[in-house]
């Protein structure tokens, strides 16, 4: 069986997020930044949705192995693409999920408006991932200095993301 490791607690986050969304069999769902496609496989198995498992860092050829191993090749379609250059038509998806990936590409002021064009009007966009309890202002606390490297500067607090998304005027948060 192909490896399914990837983002920390991706399946737990997917289960939690999906519980807050109205996913129904046959819906077309974009799983953006799906990593090794474990969240996509889960969504197909649990909800019967069709999933476009889209990731930049893991190849579609690698992900299809896991998808086949899971027996969901009929409803999970691996795509290798950059989140900032998606190959989909406007309003193609019924829903979009981003599990433990949005912070890597979504902090640009214009990104949410770009992403929203791919979901049908009033379609849900669900985002779950790691973050900060509060923003780090000023010097980094001693206990975080070793951990606080460029790799994690993209992490923000829930209140930061709320302000970031609310100002677009296109999402109910």
Residues of each region from the PLM?
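Class I SAM-dependent methyltransferase Rossmann-like catalytic core
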Residues: 1-8
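Short alpha-helix
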Residues: 153-169
């Amino acid at each position: 069986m192909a490896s399914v490791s990837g983002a920390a607690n991706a399946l737990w986050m997917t289960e939690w997020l999906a519980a807050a969304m109205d996913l129904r069999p046959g819906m077309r769902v974009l799983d953006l930044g799906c990593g090794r496609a474990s969240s996509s496989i889960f969504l197909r198995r649990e909800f019967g949705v069709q999933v476009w498992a889209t990731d930049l860092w893991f190849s579609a050829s690698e992900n299809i192995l896991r998808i086949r191993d899971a027996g969901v090749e009929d409803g999970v379609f691996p795509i290798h693409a950059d989140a900032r250059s998606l190959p989909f038509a406007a309003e193609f998806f019924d829903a979009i999920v981003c599990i433990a990936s949005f912070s890597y590409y979504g902090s640009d002021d214009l990104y949410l408006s770009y992403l929203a064009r791919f979901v049908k009007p009033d379609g849900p966009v669900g985002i779950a991932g790691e973050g900060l309890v509060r923003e780090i202002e000023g010097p980094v606390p001693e206990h975080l200095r070793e951990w606080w490297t460029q790799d994690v500067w993209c992490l923000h607090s829930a209140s930061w993301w709320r302000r970031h998304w609310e100002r677009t005027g296109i999402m109910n948060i």
